[in-house]
Amino acid sequence: MRNIKIELADKDRLRIAGVMSGTSLDGVDVAIVDVTDAGVVVKAFDTVPYPGPTRKELLRLCSGNSVDVADIAGLNVILGEIIAGAVIAVAGGAKISLKSIDLIGSHGQTIYHDPGGRRFRGRQVGFTMQIGEASVIAQRTGITTISDFRPADLAVGGEGAPLVPYADFFLFGRSGTCRAIQNIGGIANVTYLPGNGKIEEVLAFDTGPGNMVIDEIVRRMSNGRKSFDRDGRIAGSNQVDQGLFDELMKEAYFAKRPPKSTGRELFGAEYVDRLVAMAGGMGLGYEVMAATATAVTAESIAGAYRKFLPSLPQEMIVCGGGAHNRTLIDMLRERLDPMRIEPMDHFGIDCDSKEAVSFAILAYATAKGLASNVPSATGANKPVILGKIVPA
């Protein structure tokens, strides 16, 4: 029998397909990356959209409402097939042989995340669940797959999130410059890199909503014809309503101290239902709601920097879909002047590929037997190796 751990650990360079599907539920991001201890080279990246029915099923599973366990089990398998197909498609499109790929690092799709937990049979239990069956991915592609990265951090008292700080430090933390890596996906999260090269001083947490609330408002406004505010045009051509803004900024999550993480459970469809009802009572239209929600994302990020970071960074490097929202970026620049704010593209990594690249780096760490949670970010009581290895 092959000793996969030794086989992988002995290679200086690993070619890894990092796979991410985030809270926006847009589709499967695949980045094929050559990783060494010195850094990464991205060989291919693309997003494979979810089929419409699959996205609807995922939205239903992520709603927080009760669902049939058979639906979870079935979609776990189907999503494994979709992820495998996405890896095969992206590799084929880039003319990369599957045999040249050493590993797949798959985050899967989060359908529930409650690190604070609840009382369950007399115990306080924190939990997280990502689906996208790794055994299916490994068998369809013929590539050893690492998945289920979050539970190990929860098992040692952490939030199970954010996990990207290890990758942020790996990519950007050894420059000597104090930086913030600001991801704006469905949820917005920040990694604070102190500039002194010490990973134990890295901080990271979810600041609040990223694109999630804006996207849902735009979907409702357009009756599903649009899924996001392209370039921030809707927000940029409408006024922020101060009354609605003030009410939304009262959200308790914004004042909670890190470590903290959040998701669709807090800022999903039910949150938007309440926002729409509140705005309707004020006589406001969807366009003003979109502008105000954009301002809430900007202020929740800027406010978190002012309240929770040891010092204001010299640079903010922005990634995720929100990096394309010009209105949102302008709002951040206004609030955080004179901080330099630039998209990650300026540093050689596609804004949209960053999280998929991050899970390639996390898979690399696991293959090398390295702990890759950051306790100062997640609140864990010790560093641990993340993920489960499924041989092909």
Residues covered by each model-derived region:
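Conserved phosphate-binding catalytic cores of ATP/NTP-utilizing and phosphoryl-transfer enzymes
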Residues: 1-12, 110-114, 120, 125, ...
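Glycine-rich phosphate-binding loop plus the immediately following alpha-helix
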Residues: 26-33, 45-60, 139-173, 180-255
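A contiguous, well-structured pocket-lining segment that forms one wall/lid of small-molecule binding clefts
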Residues: 224-315, 326-339
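Glycine-rich beta-strand-to-loop/alpha-helix junction loops that act as flexible
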Residues: 21, 106-109, 184-186, 315-323, ...
